[in-house]
Amino acid sequence: MSSKRRQALRDFYNLPGSNSSSSTVSTTRKPSSSNTVSPVEETALDKVDPEFSDPNFDSNAYVSKFMEKATPAELLQRDKSLVASIQGLSVDHRSLVYNHYKHLLEASDAINSFCKNLNTLLPALNDAYQACPKPTRKNGNNDTYSAPQSFNGNEFSAP
């Protein structure tokens, strides 16, 4: 991979450069110059129009009404802000999918490892169980504990 590509990836993910001594990674992404959204626009995107929550919301009517009211500059600005939001959500979505997939693979590997080791651990568990003293009744108390008497490798059997 060329050094320009590596640098572009480092810039995109806010990773420290190869000559950087810092080991911290920033969690905020710098927007690209073509899709820059001002903080004012970002706060405007955070405010959701209550009309969107209406069960009878008609997206076509909303867009038509907005297009009639807005100037071409406002339309372009809204387009830029929506594209930037969609790209940000897309990056977040890919990140979530990758992270969860990675955790799923790790959990699957752990379960497979446990299942492979289970057959060797069951006889040792049975030996440890047999070595334990059995509970007995004390002082004629009627509160008794009925402990299983043996372990046959897969399940405990009652007395």
UniProtKB/Swiss-Prot annotation:
GO terms for biological process: Golgi to vacuole transport; protein transport; retrograde transport, endosome to Golgi. The modification Phosphoserine is found at S18, S21. InterPro entries: Vps51 (IPR014812). Coiled coil: none annotated. It is found in: Cytoplasm; Nucleus; Golgi apparatus, trans-Golgi network membrane; Endosome membrane. PANTHER family: VACUOLAR PROTEIN SORTING-ASSOCIATED PROTEIN 51 HOMOLOG. Involved in retrograde transport from early and late endosomes to late Golgi, leading to the membrane fusion between late Golgi and endosomal vesicles. Belongs to the VPS51 family. This is Vacuolar protein sorting-associated protein 51. It comes from Schizosaccharomyces pombe (strain 972 / ATCC 24843). The gene is vps51.
